[in-house]
A protein has these predicted regions:
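Anaerobic metallocofactor- and corrinoid-dependent redox/one-carbon enzyme cores
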Residues: 74, 181, 198
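Glycine-rich loops and low-complexity Gly/Arg-rich segments
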Residues: 8-11, 165, 208-211
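A glycine- and small-residue-enriched flexible loop/hinge signal that marks low-structured segments
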Residues: 1-150, 161
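Extended, compositionally biased non-globular segments
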Residues: 137-185
């Protein structure tokens, strides 16, 4: 997955947990994968992992979480989790599945990336985060590639590149794929005058996982 993504062919892989694996074993396996491009589902088998991959691939809006998405063709699971094991798995980088009324669905889409440099890191935990990045960056690449073929690396062209990047980011913001974006910087490389460097930042839109109600009742 990482090799393909490094070659600008962004991919996400889905693997299944063993039918009898404990929460500790699943979290340990997720920790060994520790990749924002790998998803570990449990309970279930490779068929359910494939169904989860189909759900992920079939969702056209990268900001929409797969939470609650039904895995077609399945009516039961080999095990069920209560809230505590579910939270343990989510925190540990495991995507839990559940069966309700004869339908198997994804509880919450999580990647196996839980640490960076050995320290706990939630940055890439949500599956929507990497999906949004995989939507925004290729879209910008394609837009710039289409509009600036055979261009010169002049101040005027760099200004046009900056404007185009801002247009694309504003489109993503309007689509609610990103929440916001920061300053866009475009400059010629000091090492190679034929190279244009574009830098920008953006905040991804977050999925809604839970709603907590606090009722203040007056009688």
């Amino acid at each position: 997955m990482e090799k393909a993504s490094g070659a600008q062919r962004e991919r996400i892989g889905v693997v299944s947990g063993g039918a009898s694996e404990t929460a500790a074993k699943l979290v340990e396996r997720a920790g060994k994968l520790n990749s924002e491009r790998m998803v570990l589902t449990a309970p279930g088998d490779v068929r359910m992992a494939a169904a989860a991959a189909a759900v992920i691939a079939g969702e056209s809006d990268p900001s929409v979480p797969v939470n609650g998405a039904v895995l077609a063709g399945f009516s039961g699971l080999s095990a069920s989790y209560d809230d505590t094991p579910v939270d343990t798995r989510v925190t540990g980088g495991v995507t839990p599945l559940e069966c309700v009324s004869g339908e198997v669905s994804i509880v919450r889409g999580i990647t196996t990336r839980t640490t960076t440099g050995g320290a706990a890191d939630k940055t890439w935990r949500e599956l929507t985060t990497v999906r949004i990045v995989d939507d925004v960056i290729p879209a910008l690449r394609a837009s710039l590639r289409a509009r600036f073929v055979r261009s010169t690396n002049t101040a005027q062209v760099r200004a046009a590149i900056r404007s185009q990047v801002m247009v694309e980011l504003e489109n993503k913001r309007a689509q609610e794929i990103i929440d916001s974006f920061g300053e866009v910087s475009v400059k010629a490389s000091e090492d190679d005058p034929t190279v244009c460097l574009v830098e920008f930042s953006f905040a991804v839109a977050h999925g809604l996982n839970r709603i907590y109600l606090s009722a203040h009742i007056t009688v």
